[in-house]
Amino acid sequence: MNQTDPFISRQIDLNLDIGQGPAHMLTEQEILQYATSVNIATGAHTGEPAITDKAIAAAKEHGGLAIGALISYPDLLGYGERKIQLSNEELRATVIAQLGALAALSKAHDLEISQVRPHGYLYQQMLSNYSVAETVAKAIQEFSNWLILVGPVSPVLQEVGSWTNIRVAFEARIDLRYKADGSVMPFDIERDANLDIETATARARDLVYKSAVKLEDEKDIELNFETIHLPSRIKNSVEIAKLVRGMVLKPLPLKTVDYEPYLSEFI
Protein backbone atom coordinates (compact mmCIF):
# COMPACT_ATOMS: atom_id res chain seq x y z
CA MET A 1 0.00 0.00 0.00
CA ASN A 2 1.36 3.35 -1.04
CA GLN A 3 2.30 5.39 2.03
CA THR A 4 0.65 8.48 0.54
CA ASP A 5 -2.75 6.78 0.67
CA PRO A 6 -4.97 9.32 2.52
CA PHE A 7 -6.79 6.68 4.51
CA ILE A 8 -3.58 5.46 6.19
CA SER A 9 -3.19 8.79 7.94
CA ARG A 10 -6.89 9.15 8.76
CA GLN A 11 -7.84 9.84 12.32
CA ILE A 12 -9.68 6.75 13.53
CA ASP A 13 -10.91 5.82 16.99
CA LEU A 14 -11.07 2.19 18.14
CA ASN A 15 -13.91 1.63 20.60
CA LEU A 16 -14.53 -1.30 22.93
CA ASP A 17 -17.42 -2.29 25.21
CA ILE A 18 -16.35 -3.22 28.75
CA GLY A 19 -17.89 -3.86 32.16
CA GLN A 20 -20.20 -6.49 30.70
CA GLY A 21 -19.86 -8.93 33.56
CA PRO A 22 -17.39 -11.55 34.88
CA ALA A 23 -17.79 -13.84 31.85
CA HIS A 24 -16.26 -11.25 29.54
CA MET A 25 -13.84 -9.52 31.90
CA LEU A 26 -10.64 -11.34 30.88
CA THR A 27 -11.25 -10.82 27.17
CA GLU A 28 -12.05 -7.15 27.72
CA GLN A 29 -8.82 -6.72 29.69
CA GLU A 30 -6.80 -8.26 26.84
CA ILE A 31 -8.38 -5.99 24.22
CA LEU A 32 -8.05 -2.78 26.26
CA GLN A 33 -4.47 -2.29 25.06
CA TYR A 34 -5.71 -1.95 21.47
CA ALA A 35 -8.58 0.48 22.15
CA THR A 36 -8.65 4.26 22.32
CA SER A 37 -12.21 4.58 23.66
CA VAL A 38 -14.27 2.38 25.97
CA ASN A 39 -18.03 2.14 26.39
CA ILE A 40 -18.87 0.96 29.89
CA ALA A 41 -22.07 -0.94 30.68
CA THR A 42 -24.29 1.12 32.95
CA GLY A 43 -26.30 -1.67 34.59
CA ALA A 44 -29.39 -1.64 32.39
CA HIS A 45 -28.56 -4.79 30.42
CA THR A 46 -25.68 -6.13 32.48
CA GLY A 47 -23.28 -5.13 35.19
CA GLU A 48 -23.64 -3.62 38.63
CA PRO A 49 -21.98 -0.64 40.35
CA ALA A 50 -18.97 -2.62 41.58
CA ILE A 51 -18.29 -4.07 38.13
CA THR A 52 -18.72 -0.66 36.51
CA ASP A 53 -16.33 0.85 39.03
CA LYS A 54 -13.70 -1.81 38.26
CA ALA A 55 -14.11 -1.21 34.53
CA ILE A 56 -13.53 2.52 34.99
CA ALA A 57 -10.44 1.82 37.08
CA ALA A 58 -9.09 -0.57 34.43
CA ALA A 59 -9.61 2.02 31.70
CA LYS A 60 -7.86 4.66 33.78
CA GLU A 61 -4.88 2.35 34.32
CA HIS A 62 -4.30 2.16 30.59
CA GLY A 63 -4.22 5.95 30.35
CA GLY A 64 -5.52 8.13 27.55
CA LEU A 65 -8.68 6.13 26.94
CA ALA A 66 -11.88 8.09 26.41
CA ILE A 67 -14.69 6.94 28.71
CA GLY A 68 -18.18 6.40 27.35
CA ALA A 69 -21.53 5.01 28.46
CA LEU A 70 -22.90 1.80 26.95
CA ILE A 71 -26.63 2.43 27.27
CA SER A 72 -29.51 0.07 26.58
CA TYR A 73 -33.10 -0.70 27.31
CA PRO A 74 -33.58 -1.93 30.91
CA ASP A 75 -33.34 -5.65 30.12
CA LEU A 76 -31.18 -7.72 32.45
CA LEU A 77 -32.94 -10.95 31.48
CA GLY A 78 -32.39 -10.49 27.76
CA TYR A 79 -29.00 -8.75 27.86
CA GLY A 80 -30.53 -5.75 26.14
CA GLU A 81 -31.38 -7.76 23.03
CA ARG A 82 -35.13 -8.20 23.56
CA LYS A 83 -37.61 -5.97 21.76
CA ILE A 84 -38.48 -3.76 24.71
CA GLN A 85 -41.04 -1.02 24.14
CA LEU A 86 -40.86 2.16 26.23
CA SER A 87 -42.67 5.45 25.95
CA ASN A 88 -40.54 8.44 24.97
CA GLU A 89 -40.74 9.67 28.56
CA GLU A 90 -39.57 6.32 29.94
CA LEU A 91 -36.74 6.08 27.40
CA ARG A 92 -35.57 9.62 28.16
CA ALA A 93 -35.53 8.90 31.88
CA THR A 94 -33.58 5.64 31.60
CA VAL A 95 -30.98 7.20 29.28
CA ILE A 96 -30.38 10.14 31.63
CA ALA A 97 -30.29 7.82 34.66
CA GLN A 98 -27.69 5.57 33.00
CA LEU A 99 -25.53 8.53 32.03
CA GLY A 100 -25.78 9.93 35.54
CA ALA A 101 -24.73 6.66 37.14
CA LEU A 102 -21.63 6.30 34.99
CA ALA A 103 -20.74 9.99 35.30
CA ALA A 104 -20.89 9.77 39.09
CA LEU A 105 -18.61 6.74 39.29
CA SER A 106 -16.24 8.24 36.72
CA LYS A 107 -16.02 11.45 38.73
CA ALA A 108 -14.82 9.41 41.71
CA HIS A 109 -11.85 8.43 39.51
CA ASP A 110 -11.33 12.05 38.35
CA LEU A 111 -12.63 11.17 34.89
CA GLU A 112 -15.43 12.50 32.70
CA ILE A 113 -17.51 10.64 30.14
CA SER A 114 -17.16 11.83 26.55
CA GLN A 115 -19.34 9.56 24.42
CA VAL A 116 -22.48 7.41 24.47
CA ARG A 117 -23.02 4.17 22.55
CA PRO A 118 -26.34 2.29 22.39
CA HIS A 119 -26.33 -1.48 22.87
CA GLY A 120 -28.42 -4.36 21.57
CA TYR A 121 -31.97 -3.68 20.43
CA LEU A 122 -31.56 0.03 21.13
CA TYR A 123 -28.57 0.05 18.74
CA GLN A 124 -30.69 -1.57 16.02
CA GLN A 125 -33.50 0.93 16.51
CA MET A 126 -31.11 3.83 16.00
CA LEU A 127 -30.87 2.70 12.37
CA SER A 128 -34.43 3.45 11.34
CA ASN A 129 -36.68 4.49 14.24
CA TYR A 130 -36.66 8.28 14.18
CA SER A 131 -38.68 8.65 17.38
CA VAL A 132 -36.33 6.45 19.39
CA ALA A 133 -33.20 8.05 17.92
CA GLU A 134 -34.54 11.55 18.57
CA THR A 135 -35.51 10.71 22.15
CA VAL A 136 -32.07 9.27 22.88
CA ALA A 137 -30.31 12.24 21.28
CA LYS A 138 -32.43 14.77 23.17
CA ALA A 139 -31.79 12.95 26.46
CA ILE A 140 -28.05 13.04 25.79
CA GLN A 141 -28.26 16.74 24.96
CA GLU A 142 -30.15 17.41 28.19
CA PHE A 143 -27.39 15.70 30.12
CA SER A 144 -24.51 17.37 28.27
CA ASN A 145 -24.07 19.19 24.97
CA TRP A 146 -20.51 17.89 24.80
CA LEU A 147 -21.24 14.18 24.64
CA ILE A 148 -20.70 12.34 21.34
CA LEU A 149 -23.36 9.86 20.21
CA VAL A 150 -21.70 6.80 18.68
CA GLY A 151 -23.87 4.67 16.44
CA PRO A 152 -24.38 2.82 13.17
CA VAL A 153 -24.23 4.57 9.81
CA SER A 154 -27.77 5.78 9.34
CA PRO A 155 -29.51 8.73 7.65
CA VAL A 156 -31.91 8.77 10.61
CA LEU A 157 -29.08 9.18 13.08
CA GLN A 158 -27.44 11.81 10.91
CA GLU A 159 -30.65 13.84 10.72
CA VAL A 160 -31.31 13.51 14.44
CA GLY A 161 -27.79 14.67 15.24
CA SER A 162 -28.25 17.78 13.12
CA TRP A 163 -31.69 18.49 14.53
CA THR A 164 -30.64 18.16 18.18
CA ASN A 165 -27.26 19.79 17.59
CA ILE A 166 -25.18 17.00 19.10
CA ARG A 167 -22.20 15.39 17.47
CA VAL A 168 -22.83 11.98 15.96
CA ALA A 169 -19.89 9.69 15.22
CA PHE A 170 -20.62 6.82 12.88
CA GLU A 171 -18.91 3.54 13.64
CA ALA A 172 -17.80 0.73 11.35
CA ARG A 173 -18.33 -2.90 12.31
CA ILE A 174 -15.95 -5.69 11.39
CA ASP A 175 -18.12 -8.32 13.05
CA LEU A 176 -21.30 -7.57 11.09
CA ARG A 177 -22.37 -7.73 7.46
CA TYR A 178 -23.66 -4.69 5.56
CA LYS A 179 -26.62 -3.90 3.33
CA ALA A 180 -26.33 -1.95 0.08
CA ASP A 181 -27.55 1.24 1.79
CA GLY A 182 -24.61 1.13 4.22
CA SER A 183 -26.58 -0.10 7.22
CA VAL A 184 -25.52 -3.10 9.28
CA MET A 185 -27.44 -6.35 9.31
CA PRO A 186 -28.66 -7.72 12.67
CA PHE A 187 -26.20 -9.93 14.54
CA ASP A 188 -26.45 -13.59 13.49
CA ILE A 189 -25.02 -15.75 16.28
CA GLU A 190 -24.28 -18.73 14.03
CA ARG A 191 -22.44 -16.70 11.42
CA ASP A 192 -21.15 -13.53 13.04
CA ALA A 193 -20.06 -15.01 16.38
CA ASN A 194 -17.60 -17.29 14.59
CA LEU A 195 -15.87 -14.70 12.43
CA ASP A 196 -12.61 -16.16 11.11
CA ILE A 197 -9.33 -14.26 11.04
CA GLU A 198 -9.08 -14.28 7.23
CA THR A 199 -12.48 -12.61 6.80
CA ALA A 200 -11.81 -10.18 9.65
CA THR A 201 -8.48 -9.19 8.09
CA ALA A 202 -10.07 -8.53 4.70
CA ARG A 203 -12.82 -6.43 6.27
CA ALA A 204 -10.33 -4.46 8.35
CA ARG A 205 -8.18 -3.71 5.31
CA ASP A 206 -11.20 -2.51 3.35
CA LEU A 207 -12.21 -0.19 6.19
CA VAL A 208 -8.82 1.25 7.08
CA TYR A 209 -7.28 1.52 3.62
CA LYS A 210 -10.33 2.07 1.40
CA SER A 211 -13.01 3.32 3.82
CA ALA A 212 -15.26 0.67 2.31
CA VAL A 213 -17.18 -2.49 3.14
CA LYS A 214 -17.81 -5.49 0.92
CA LEU A 215 -21.37 -6.69 0.40
CA GLU A 216 -22.38 -10.33 0.04
CA ASP A 217 -22.34 -9.93 -3.76
CA GLU A 218 -18.67 -8.85 -3.46
CA LYS A 219 -19.48 -5.25 -4.38
CA ASP A 220 -17.64 -2.55 -2.40
CA ILE A 221 -19.49 0.49 -1.06
CA GLU A 222 -17.97 3.54 0.60
CA LEU A 223 -18.55 3.91 4.33
CA ASN A 224 -17.59 7.13 6.07
CA PHE A 225 -16.93 6.65 9.76
CA GLU A 226 -14.90 7.97 12.67
CA THR A 227 -14.57 4.89 14.85
CA ILE A 228 -14.21 1.13 14.45
CA HIS A 229 -15.89 -1.12 17.01
CA LEU A 230 -13.68 -3.84 18.49
CA PRO A 231 -15.98 -6.79 19.32
CA SER A 232 -15.29 -8.62 22.57
CA ARG A 233 -17.97 -11.31 22.62
CA ILE A 234 -17.11 -13.28 19.49
CA LYS A 235 -14.55 -15.91 18.56
CA ASN A 236 -11.04 -14.55 17.87
CA SER A 237 -11.95 -11.16 19.34
CA VAL A 238 -8.48 -10.53 20.83
CA GLU A 239 -6.71 -11.45 17.60
CA ILE A 240 -9.12 -9.29 15.59
CA ALA A 241 -8.51 -6.29 17.85
CA LYS A 242 -4.75 -6.76 17.52
CA LEU A 243 -4.82 -6.90 13.72
CA VAL A 244 -7.06 -3.81 13.46
CA ARG A 245 -4.78 -1.88 15.80
CA GLY A 246 -1.82 -2.88 13.66
CA MET A 247 -3.41 -1.36 10.57
CA VAL A 248 -4.25 2.01 12.12
CA LEU A 249 -1.02 3.98 12.41
CA LYS A 250 -2.20 6.48 14.99
CA PRO A 251 -5.61 5.76 16.51
CA LEU A 252 -7.09 8.62 18.51
CA PRO A 253 -9.99 8.82 20.99
CA LEU A 254 -13.12 10.36 19.51
CA LYS A 255 -12.90 13.35 21.81
CA THR A 256 -9.56 14.29 20.21
CA VAL A 257 -10.45 13.46 16.59
CA ASP A 258 -10.97 16.58 14.51
CA TYR A 259 -14.60 16.69 13.45
CA GLU A 260 -15.02 17.17 9.72
CA PRO A 261 -18.47 17.42 8.10
CA TYR A 262 -17.56 15.09 5.24
CA LEU A 263 -17.36 12.22 7.70
CA SER A 264 -21.10 12.55 8.23
CA GLU A 265 -21.90 12.36 4.53
CA PHE A 266 -22.09 8.73 3.51
CA ILE A 267 -22.89 6.69 0.44
Outline where the language-model segments fall.
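Glycine-rich tight-turn/loop motif centered on a GG-T
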Residues: 37-45, 77-92, 126, 183-195
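Acidic (Asp/Glu)-rich catalytic clusters
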Residues: 29-33, 54-68, 106-110
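C-terminal domain-boundary segment and adjacent tail
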Residues: 147, 241-267
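Hydrophobic faces of well-ordered beta-strands that scaffold small-molecule active sites
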Residues: 12-18, 38-40, 67-71, 114-118, ...
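Glycine/small-residue-rich loop that forms an oxyanion/phosphate-binding "nest" at active or ligand-binding sites
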Residues: 76-115
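Catalytic beta/alpha-barrel core
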Residues: 40-45, 125, 143-153
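Active-site rim beta-loop-alpha module in soluble metabolic enzymes
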Residues: 154-213, 219-221
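Flexible, glycine/charged-enriched surface loops at secondary-structure junctions
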Residues: 108-114, 212-224, 254-262
